[in-house]
UniProtKB/Swiss-Prot annotation:
One of its GO terms (biological process) is translation. This is Small ribosomal subunit protein uS14. One of its GO terms (molecular function) is structural constituent of ribosome. Keywords: Ribonucleoprotein, Ribosomal protein, RNA-binding, rRNA-binding. Belongs to the universal ribosomal protein uS14 family. One of its GO terms (cellular component) is small ribosomal subunit. Part of the 30S ribosomal subunit. Contacts proteins S3 and S10. Binds 16S rRNA, required for the assembly of 30S particles and may also be responsible for determining the conformation of the 16S rRNA at the A site.
Amino acid sequence: MAKESVKARNLKRQALVERYAAKRAKLKEAGDYLALDKLPKNASPVRVRNRCKITGRARGYMRKFGISRIVFREWAAQGKIPGVIKASW
């Protein structure tokens, strides 16, 4: 389980990215990299880390489901993810 402060920091970054998205796109289109450099560092989408919605784990993240591999495995075994069944051959 990730620390609450790390999760909160990532949420703050996501909010900044959303807030400055239009401005960043406009500046990039114009090629004004000096003005782009003046924006907050955390306004860049590259700084946001994909994290599990349940545990906050950063590694082993599955984009399609928004959860980590560990939570995915548990939920799949319990049948909580529709359409996912354990492979058998």
